[in-house]
Amino acid sequence: MAVTAVVTVAGCSHTIDGTAERASADTADPDRSFGYVDDRCGLLVDSTIQEILAADNVVRPYSGAVCQYVLSRKAGAAPNADPQPMLDVIFSWFEAGSLGRERELSQRRSAEITDIVIERHRAFLARRDVTGAACSATAAAGSGVISWWVQFRGATNAGKGDPCQDAKKLLSATLQSEL
């Protein structure tokens, strides 16, 4: 019995050569395009965005280097919950942009900045709750930067979720997507 276990363990071991790759701004293909193509923004179709954000409805009133979405979710169970919580979402790709410039702009607007790494890309979250709970997730990608911005309409986000987590999910999905 003991011999069988040793043979099984030995048969399952496997060594992989190479070294771990650190996160960096240039891990992505510099020629990769994240722009609007084939009815996709940030490489994602509308139904994927709807699924990621658990939305009941999605409308994309504008598409281009910047894509705008309006989404709605079912009302919460709380007695004072919005009848249909609304989210505003924007994807942007700045082909020749820089993460430093986007970070500086967010700081000038008094956003709360959190440095993160998403899918091995340097990134940051910028939280700024002015007209509703809002957050953007921005990463260095290709030759520039991509960003997903999510805002819950209204003064608070009680019961609506976390806009930073939603923005991170969208950014992660874009960085994972294949052309």
Predicted regions and their residues:
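N-terminal export and membrane-targeting signals
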Residues: 1-3
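Extracellular/mature segments of secreted proteins
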Residues: 47-52, 73-81, 143-144, 171-175
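A short, solvent-exposed beta-edge/loop patch
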Residues: 107-179
